[in-house]
C-alpha cells in the first residue's frame, strides 16, 4: 500500500516539509491549508515541486462546519467550498477532507445533514472533486464514524465517502469492528495516529498529544485490520498533532514517522489481521 503524511506533523515551512517527506520515502502528502497559506510559493509551484519530488497530493484539508445549518448559512458554505475547489484545482488534487460540524448552532438532523452534503457533493462533482466526511471526536452531534457513514449513505453520492481517523474513533472508545460494514470503496481516506491514555479534554488531547504508531496505547494493529478487511485500498496516512514533533528537526521527524508505518504494517501482518499479505506492498513500507 502507498504511504502518506499530513504536513501538519512536521516543523518548518511547506517546501522544507515536502523535501523531508520525499527524503523519508513517503509516496504522498496531505496538505494543510494553513501550510499552503503560509507558503511563499503559489499552489502551482507547490504542485510542480511535489511532482518533481515524486509526491502525490493525496488530500487537501480541512474544510469545516458545513452541514446541519440554516439555508442562508449553507449558501455561504457553498461559496466557501467553491473557493476551496479553486485552490484544489491549482494544486492538482481531487480529495477534500470535510470535518463534522462543531458549531453550537448546528441542527441535529441527519436528513438535513445528508441533503446538504449531497448538494455539496454535487457542486464538487462538477469540478471532478471527491469529499471525505470525517466524524470529529468533538463534533457537535456527529462524533461517531458510524453516524458519519449513515449520513453519507443517506446522501448517496458517488463522490462522497468517509475519512476514518484512528484517534477520533479510538479516543472515544467506539468499536472499530463495525468499520467492516462500510464498503471499501466508500472509505475515501485513512488517517492514523497513536496516543497515550490520558484523562483530559479530547480536543486538547488530539491537538497536542498524538503520537506515531507504536508510541501510545491505542490498538492500531486491530484498527488497521478492520479497515483493510473492509476493502480499503488507499494510502496509509499519518495525521499526528504533537507540539514536540512540530519543533524538532523536520528530516529526522519525517524519517521517524515513516519508520512507524513500517512497524505498523509489520505488526498488522504478523498478527494475521490482513486478509491478503500481498495487499501490503513491501516496497512501500520499508
Question: Where in this protein do the model-derived segments appear?
Answer:
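Glycine-rich, positively charged N-terminal anion/phosphate-binding segment
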Residues: 38-54
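Histidine-acidic metal/acid-base catalytic patches
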Residues: 1-4, 11-24, 51-53, 92, ...
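Short, conserved active-site loops that position catalytic residues or coordinate cofactors/metal ions
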Residues: 24-33, 58-65, 100
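Acidic-and-aromatic substrate-binding clefts and catalytic sites of carbohydrate-active enzymes
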Residues: 7-15, 31-43, 65-74, 103-108, ...
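Short catalytic-loop micro-motif centered on adjacent basic/acidic residues
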Residues: 4-7, 30-31, 132-135, 163-165
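Residue-level detector of anion-binding/catalytic polar loops
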Residues: 27-28, 56, 94, 130, ...
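Active-site acidic/histidine proton-transfer and metal-coordination neighborhood
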Residues: 52, 67-162, 171
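Conserved beta-strand positions in the central sheet of alpha/beta enzyme cores
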Residues: 30, 59-61, 97, 132, ...
Amino acid at each position: 500500500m502507498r504511504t502518506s503524511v499530513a504536513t501538519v506533523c512536521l516543523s518548518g515551512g511547506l517546501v522544507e516539509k515536502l523535501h523531508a517527506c520525499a527524503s523519508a520515502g513517503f509516496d504522498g502528502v496531505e496538505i494543510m491549508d494553513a501550510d499552503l497559506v503560509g507558503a511563499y510559493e503559489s499552489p502551482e509551484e507547490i504542485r510542480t515541486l511535489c511532482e518533481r519530488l515524486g509526491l502525490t497530493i493525496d488530500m487537501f484539508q480541512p474544510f469545516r462546519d458545513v452541514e446541519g445549518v440554516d439555508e442562508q448559512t449553507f449558501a455561504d458554505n457553498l461559496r466557501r467550498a467553491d473557493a476551496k475547489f479553486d485552490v484544489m484545482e491549482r494544486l492538482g488534487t481531487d480529495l477534500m477532507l470535510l470535518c463534522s460540524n462543531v458549531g453550537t448552532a448546528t441542527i441535529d438532523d441527519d436528513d438535513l445533514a445528508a441533503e446538504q452534503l449531497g448538494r455539496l457533493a454535487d457542486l464538487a462533482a462538477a469540478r471532478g472533486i471527491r469529499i471525505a466526511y470525517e466524524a470529529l471526536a468533538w463534533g457537535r452531534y456527529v462524533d461517531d464514524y458510524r453516524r458519519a457513514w449513515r449520513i453519507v449513505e443517506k446522501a448517496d453520492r458517488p463522490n462522497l465517502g468517509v475519512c476514518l481517523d484512528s484517534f477520533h474513533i479510538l479516543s472515544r472508545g467506539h468499536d472499530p469492528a463495525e468499520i467492516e460494514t462500510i464498503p471499501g470503496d466508500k472509505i475515501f481516506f485513512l488517517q492514523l495516529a497513536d496516543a497515550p491514555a490520558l484523562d483530559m479534554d479530547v480536543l486538547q488531547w488530539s491537538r497536542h498529544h498524538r503520537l506515531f504508531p507504536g508510541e501510545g496505547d491505542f490498538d492500531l494493529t486491530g484498527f488497521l485490520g478492520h479497515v483493510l478487511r473492509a476493502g480499503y485500498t488507499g494510502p496509509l496516512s499519518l495525521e499526528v498533532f504533537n507540539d514536540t514533533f512540530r519543533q524538532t528537526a523536520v528530516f529526522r521527524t519525517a524519517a521517524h514517522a515513516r519508520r512507524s508505518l513500517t512497524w505498523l504494517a509489520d505488526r498488522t501482518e504478523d498478527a494475521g489481521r490482513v486478509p491478503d499479505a500481498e495487499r501490503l506492498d513491501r516496497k512501500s513500507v520499508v
